[in-house]
Amino acid sequence: MLGYHLKKNVKPIVKHPFFAFIVFGLVLILLQILSWTAGFPKSSAMSGIATVLIYSIVGFGFTYLLGYAGLASLGTAGFTGLGAYIVGYFLRETGVPYIVSILVVLAVSIILGVAVGFISLRIEGIFLAIVTLGLSEILYQIFTNWIDFTGGPNGSSASIPIFQKWLGLSTTTSKRAMFIVLVVVVVFLMIITFNLCKSSTGRAMLAMKNSTSAAQAMGISLLRYRLLAFVLSTVYAGIGGIMFMSYLGYASPTNWTLMFSLNLLAAVIIGGTRSLWGTIVG
C-alpha cells in the first residue's frame, strides 16, 4: 500500500518537465563539486561546460524570436557584448552593487529590444536580419574604439563578483562558486522559457509566425508580440553577457563578431528552434 501511494505521488513529479530541468542543474552542480574536491572533471572541462551554458542562455532567446515569432536577427553578438561590457565597466570602475549593474544591463536590453521590435513592423525576413546585423556592427565599432568603456582592441577585465568581494574567496574558488550561480540562472531561464512558450503568449507568437494575416484576424496584436519577442531575445542576450563577464572575467571585441551570431543561429537551428534541450546540445 505504501509503495502504491509513493508511486502515485512521485510519478507526476518525475513526469513534470521542470523535474528534468532541475535534475540537469543538480547533475551539473554535482560535477562542479566533484571537480572542486576530487579534481575530476578537470577545471578546463568545467570551463567548457560553463561556456556552453552561457551560449545556451543567449540561444534560449532565439526560441522566442525564431522558433515562435519567426523573426530573424543577426544582432545577437552586439547585444550580448553590450551586456558583458556594461557589467564589466560597473564592476571595474564604479563602486555600485553588482545587482545595480545587472539592472542597467536589463534596462538597456529592453530599450534595444523595443527599438528593434518597432523596426520589425516595417521590414521582415532577410532585410530584418541585415538591419540587426548593421546594428551589431555599429556596436562592434563602439566596442573597438571606445577605449575608456571597453578597453578597445585589448579588451577589458573585471574581477568575479559576489563571492570574491563579499566572502573574500580566491579568484579560483570564486569562479567555481560562480559556476553554481550560472547553473541556477540557466535552470531558472529554462523554466521561464518553457512556461512562456506553452502559454497563450507562445501560442500567439506561433500564430503570428504561421500567418500574420490570420493572427491579426484572430485579434493578435503584431506590435505587442513582436516587441515582446525582441525584448525577450535581447534580455536573454544581455543576461548571457552578464554571465560571460562574471564567469570568465574578460571580454574583447573579437568575442562579438558576426561569427558569434552565426554560430548561435546554427546551434539553434541544428538543435531545433523550439527545443531548449536542442539549443544546449546544438
What is each of the regions a protein language model found here?
Residues 1-282:
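Transmembrane alpha-helices and adjacent helix-loop boundaries
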